[in-house]
From Swiss-Prot:
Known catalytic reactions: diphosphate + H2O = 2 phosphate + H(+)
EC number from the UniProt entry: 3.6.1.1
Residue sites binding Mn(2+) 1 per the record: 9, 13, 75
Domain of life the protein comes from: Bacteria
Binding, Mn(2+) 2: 15, 75, 97, 149
Annotated source species: Bacillus licheniformis (strain ATCC 14580 / DSM 13 / JCM 2505 / CCUG 7422 / NBRC 12200 / NCIMB 9375 / NCTC 10341 / NRRL NRS-1264 / Gibson 46)
An annotated GO cellular component: cytoplasm
Name the UniProt record assigns to this protein: Probable manganese-dependent inorganic pyrophosphatase
Cysteine disulfide links: none
Length: 309
């Protein structure tokens, strides 16, 4: 077997990058020739975590079939979120914590999906199940992933298992989860140097909801006005993306990590679905969603329901 490439979704976040690294490390310990790679540029939060725990940025790839015949997916399963030539390779494994959609394989595979807040929480179990000790820096990366996905344990996606795993990993890494976590989240929330096109692609995922093609992008900030003061440009870029990608709906979610509220900006012919999904009224294509921070648990399910049929 050729080298196995391990990667998460396009527009990678901290869980996608850190879990690819951590799982590749486990697989190598178990005798597999594995390499973590990425499908896009890393964000400021992820960069902070990698530097803190002495990890190299995984290699960027646009295709995989040109160098391997086997891959492992972490932190995603939906085809449109994965590498473009996924159908040309064999998917050996999937380790994920999201809904299963638009995914099928020609061969049997190992599929581990759990309703937890982060892929790294599952990896913590896999290390234990395989009797492999987690190295200090790898533990730090896995902790970073959990902090990121759970917004420092405040997200409704966060489970007791995530909190328990984070405590274990923080002890191994030798850091205080709360103080380190806040520093890491703040590093990711500094959006001042980012252009609007960059903000729309930092953490964007495409979904099929009923017969609709939907993209949801999310950024975290300590002040939503950092983004919304550029609303005119946001509207223009959203409309451009809708046209170029053939989207029915593009939802841009700006999340305040201090108040745990989000502001959404909607564009596309199906924009009214946002009103139905969240029982809000769009004013200038914009609405505030109180207490909403999780795309996976609080945005995707009601929007999917609103776009049925």
């Amino acid at each position: 077997m050729s080298k196995v490439l391990i990667f998460g979704h396009k527009n990678p976040d901290t869980d996608t990058i850190c879990s690819a690294i951590a799982y590749a490390e486990l697989k190598k310990e178990l005798g597999m020739d594995a390499e973590p790679v990425r499908l896009g540029e890393i964000n400021g939060e992820t960069e902070y975590a990698l530097k803190k725990f002495n990890a190299e940025v995984p290699r960027l790839v646009n295709t995989v079939a040109n160098e391997t015949d086997s891959v492992i997916l972490v932190d995603h399963n939906e085809r449109q979120q994965s590498v473009d030539d996924l159908d040309q390779v064999r998917v050996l494994e999937v380790i994920d914590h999201h809904r299963i959609a638009n995914f099928e394989t020609s061969d049997p595979l190992y599929y581990r999906a759990e309703p937890v807040g982060c892929t790294a929480t599952i990896l913590n179990k896999l290390y234990k199940e395989n009797g492999v000790e987690i190295k200090k820096d790898i533990a730090g990366l896995m902790l970073s992933a959990i902090i990121s996905d759970s917004l420092l344990f405040k997200s409704p996606t966060c489970t007791e298992e995530d909190v328990k795993a984070a405590k274990e990993l923080a002890a191994i890494a030798g850091v205080d989860a709360d103080s380190y976590g806040l520093d890491m989240l703040k590093a990711g929330a500094d959006l001042s140097a980012k252009t609007i096109p960059q903000l729309l692609s930092l953490d964007a995922k495409e979904f099929t909801m009923g017969s609709h093609k939907v993209e949801i992008a999310q950024v975290n900030t300590v002040d939503t006005n950092d983004v919304l003061s550029r609303k005119e440009e946001v509207d223009a870029e959203l409309a451009k993306a809708v046209s170029e990608k053939g989207l029915d709906l593009f939802v841009f979610v700006v999340t305040d990590i201090l108040t745990n509220d989000s502001v959404v900006v909607a564009s596309g012919q199906a924009a009214q679905a946002v009103e139905k999904a969240f029982n809000v009224t769009l004013a200038d294509n914009t609405a505030t969603l109180k207490g909403v921070v999780s795309r996976k648990k609080q945005i995707v399910p009601p929007l999917t329901e609103a776009l049925k049929g």
